[in-house]
A protein has these predicted regions:
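Glycine- and hydrophobic-rich flexible loops that cap the catalytic core of alpha/beta enzyme folds
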Residues: 2-178
Length: 178
């Protein structure tokens, strides 16, 4: 029997240039507007506890952490799989895509968060959460393009809906600071 080991990780450590498969039995993304709103509110409140407008970008690394909850990963010789935490990691990826798109619109210094969203796989960029049926949708969101949801499964429609929720609930006062 395999031993379960707990480790505290940052988002960078968890998602940076990593690939995670999601087993077929838990691929449906089901978060609702309420879940996204709570996540954004929690992250915003935690961030604003430390934030000062005069802080340099590098000072953010000293800000307090927000606990996203337990995320269980199973690993074999060739692949990592998310056992628990798929909804949170998918939502976090949508938020990172949103923040990346905000940065694209700004002329100021940018933080390269793209490796948290996708990474090179033998010179081919692919998303860090490996769910092939989501690729076209995620690509459109990443590129800031409209995605035709005609005939798409509920999980894909839900992805687009939650991305739109992030756009709606993300605090205006932080959009320039993204």
């Amino acid at each position: 029997m395999q031993e379960i080991q707990g480790k505290t990780r940052t988002v960078q450590e968890l998602l940076g240039n990593a690939k995670y498969g999601i087993d077929y039995y838990q691929r449906e993304y089901q978060w609702q507007t309420k879940n996204i709103s709570e996540l954004i509110d929690d992250l915003t409140n935690r961030f604003l506890e430390d934030y000062q407008a005069e802080h340099e970008l590098r000072e953010i690394t000293k800000y307090g952490y927000y606990f996203l909850g337990s995320i269980l990963i199973s690993e074999n010789e060739t692949q990592k799989f998310i056992v628990d935490g798929q909804q949170r990691l998918t939502s976090l990826t949508l938020l990172l895509i949103f923040l990346n798109n905000l940065q694209k619109k700004q002329c100021s210094k940018k933080v390269n968060i793209e490796p948290l969203i996708f990474s090179d796989d033998y010179f081919d960029k692919s998303f860090n959460l490996v769910v092939p049926e989501r690729n076209a949708c995620m690509e459109a969101l990443f590129n800031g393009e409209c995605f035709d949801m005609t005939g798409q499964p509920d999980s894909i429609v839900n992805l687009v809906g939650r991305y739109n929720d992030i756009e709606d609930v993300f605090p205006e006062e932080l959009k320039d600071e993204a």
